[in-house]
Amino acid sequence: MPASTSTSTSTSSSAHSANEEPTQDAGLRARLVEAGVELVAREGVQALSLREIARQAGVSHGAPRRYFPTHLDLLSAIARRGFADLAARTAEVLDGNDGSPRARLTSLARTYLDFALSEPGMYELMFRHDLLESNRLGLRDTSLPLFQVLVDLVARIRPSTDPPPSVVAGALWGNLHGVAQLWGWGSLPLATGSDDIEPLLRATLDAHLGPEAR
């Protein structure tokens, strides 16, 4: 009987450890991603070395390799958090907006610029596809739906299919991206002599969608 009790206790302990291991792994994986999110917000993309992320997370410099096969995989997981944040902000402004498609798209574009200027490090990482594995870790699942929202709004504002809405949306996105970058670098405020980005936002929308009735 004592031997049987000992075996039972040992088996129970092993099962408990096995159950704890996936939870612990998930926790450490999440901690590495969170460390990267904090690091990119504070110091920018250039700070996201494996060693620095590990130091920020309080783990050994070799620990990230246990959870992310490559550096790009870890950067992609960090960028996914950025896309999720942008998606949440977008949903918040659109869900409570019953205005016209043009008004909704204006709110979407404004949210995009606000995100770019308030989170410059994360914003840069999200679109640095030379640093990311976009076909892994669900990155496309979080990034492409955002673009589709833009395409759908463009299609409602501009029913013409020549060029198709996806092309117009792509050109509009590229223009907004350029405005965000040049504004963040200080080039556009200097060139325009203004500290108000709103006129540039509206001019960008007018250029791709036609003038808005005012």
Could you describe each region identified by the protein language model?
Residues S107, D114-D152, W185, L190:
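Short secondary-structure transition hinges
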Residues R81-L105, L137-D152:
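Amphipathic alpha-helical linker/stalk segments
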Residues L125, W173-A191, D206-R214:
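Amphipathic C-terminal alpha-helical segment
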Residues A35-R42, D85-G96, N175-L182:
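Solvent-exposed, amphipathic alpha-helical segments
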Residues R31, A35, L39-D73, A77:
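Helix-turn-helix
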Residues M1-G27, A213-R214:
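N-terminal intrinsically disordered/low-complexity leader segments
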Residues S134-P159, S166-G170, D195-A207:
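Amphipathic alpha-helical packing segments from all-alpha helical-bundle domains
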Residues A77, A91-M122, P165, A169-L172:
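Hydrophobic alpha-helical connector segments
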